[in-house]
């Protein structure tokens, strides 16, 4: 959920995580990556027509503007019906306020003092307690036409 708070608050959150973790403690983060949106944009011809029609994002310009404006800045009032029963209402508390990539996380976490920043596959971990924790929206409509998450583990 770190993508739902702005960059300054996200940095404060990471600092607080570092402060309260015991030495050797592990933090795991999983969130969408801005690289995913860029991949969709640059590989638009590979996105299925079905996904484009269901999402209403039928051109790559419309897709990237939706991503930048609605998801990053927040948009009041638009309702997005995902599968006929679940609706996400855009409001300033829902949409993405800051999107990360691996380089950004790596820099910030190491600057704060974390060590061993490891980018891992979703649902996988060297720690049995951290395996399979990620949960994403389900349903017949897939929100992203590609896999685009960042999952990382880092130690204090």
Regions found by a protein language model. Give the residues of each.
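A short His-aromatic
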Residues: 3-5
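S-adenosyl-L-methionine-dependent methyltransferase catalytic module, highlighting the catalytic core
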Residues: 7-22, 26-153
């Amino acid at each position: 959920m770190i993508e739902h708070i702005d960059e300054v608050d996200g940095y404060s959150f990471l600092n607080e995580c570092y402060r309260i973790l015991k030495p050797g403690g592990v933090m795991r983060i999983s969130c969408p990556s801005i690289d995913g949106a860029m991949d969709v944009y640059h590989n638009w011809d590979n996105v299925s027509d079905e996904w484009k029609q269901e999402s209403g994002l039928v051109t790559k310009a419309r897709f990237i503007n939706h991503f930048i404006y609605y998801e990053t800045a927040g948009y009041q009032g638009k309702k997005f019906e995902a599968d006929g029963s679940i609706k996400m209402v855009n409001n300033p508390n829902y949409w993405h306020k800051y999107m990360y990539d691996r380089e950004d996380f790596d820099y910030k976490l190491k600057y704060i003092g974390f060590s061993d920043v490891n980018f891992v596959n979703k649902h996988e971990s060297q720690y049995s307690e951290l395996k399979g924790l990620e949960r994403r929206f389900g349903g017949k409509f897939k929100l992203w036409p590609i896999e685009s998450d960042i999952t990382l583990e880092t130690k204090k």
